[in-house]
Amino acid sequence: MKIEKIYPKGFAANTYFVTADGKNAVVVDPAQPRIFSLLAERALAPAYVLLTHAHFDHVGGVSALQRAGAKVLCSEEEARLIGTQADLCEEFGAPPSDFHSDETFSDGETKSLCGLKVTAISTPG
């Protein structure tokens, strides 16, 4: 398994690429659209996007990854918030969210993604 922290420009979110096979990636909190090109530079295909939360500064690259075939996963609570922050986006000059959640997960639930076992741990607050 390889985990790479990506340092975006502008809004600083903790974006990560995680891969078990060196070909398919799970992307955590893709803050910016350029995340798609950074994956391509590493010859990684975006298979899944995991969102820790749906604030605009963590989801800027989700639309591009979803259009490329990545499945978007987040908690049920965050799935309800997707697309509801247009005024906050406008205030910070960020485009509004244009994606949807493909799957949701619950606290403590484990999923297998690209050969990786991922367990959700809720940390509200």
Protein language model features and the residues they cover:
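Active-site HxH/HxHxD metal-binding segment of metal-dependent hydrolases
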Residues: 12, 32-114
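Conserved beta-strand hairpin/beta-sheet module of binuclear metal-dependent hydrolase folds
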Residues: 1-44
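Short Gly/Pro-enriched turn/cap motifs at secondary-structure boundaries
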Residues: 6-8, 94, 100-102, 121-124
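Active-site flanking residues adjacent to catalytic metal/cofactor-binding acidic residues
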Residues: 28, 52, 121
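Structural motif
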Residues: 24-26, 48, 116
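Core dinuclear metal-dependent hydrolase active-site scaffold
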Residues: 2-3, 17-19, 108-125
